Structure formats: C-alpha cells, structure tokens
Amino acid sequence: VESLDSPGLARELQRQAEKHGRVVDVLIEINIGREPAKSGVLPEDAEELVRAVCGGYDRLRLRGFTTMAPKGDAASYRRLFGEMRRLSESLWELTPGRNEPMVLSMGMSDSYRYAVAEGATLVRVGRALFARGDGDTE
C-alpha cells in the first residue's frame, strides 16, 4: 500500500490484514507541498503516524515514504524533494528493525530527474513511457 496517510486507514489495514492472515508493506504518504486538494499526512504530523504504525500495528510493515510534489519548476522540485528526503531519513531512524533499505517514492514524468537526484528509489513515470507524442495515452 503506497498511500497510508492516517491512523484510521492504518487501523483498517491492520484489521483486514489480521482477517486475511497477511502482513502488508506500507509507504506513508506525506503531503510535502501542503496542498489542500492532495492526500497525505502533513510533514509536522508524520512522526506521530510513524510511531503509531511501528508501535501498534503488527500486521503493517513500514517500508518507507511517498509524496507527490506540486507541479513546479526545477528549483521548487529540488527544494521539495530535498525536504522530503531529509524528513524521510529522520523518520526512518524511528523505525525499529530497519533490516531493509528505506523506499523513497517521489517524482513523476515531469520531475523524476530531480527526485532521483534527491534520493528517490521509486519513481512513477507512466506518462513518459506510454504517452504518444501529442500527450495522449491511447
């Protein structure tokens, strides 16, 4: 699950995972651009969610963090992705038993180069791969 952004969703994922006898890998989604229309926990509330997931949900395995930056220019992408990397690294230190590398999912077709430069380990570039020259995907 790449969009865990609230304690309520964590509780429901835990409940469903228990019901089906599974452990679910999750990424906590952080609204790094603080956009009201986008989902994700605000940066200042992320630590509380990390502590809740790591401390109270044995069926959820925190693997890392994800964000979707607002559309912008190179400077704004670099700034936001740098902020996200630093925040994610500090939050990852709170994660017990960090036996695997942290997943840092950020960057899309317009911004993945900046995201990778700031440490992204996962990018979403569907449009860059599948769009025709006119921007259409069909």
Language-model segment annotations:
Residues G119-T121, G126:
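Active-site-proximal glycine-rich helix-loop-beta segment
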Residues V1-Y112, V116-E118, F130:
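Conserved alpha/beta-domain cores
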Residues L122, A131-G133:
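EAL-family c-di-GMP phosphodiesterase catalytic domain
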Residues D136-E138:
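Active-site loop ensemble at the mouth of alpha/beta enzyme cores that anchors a bound cofactor
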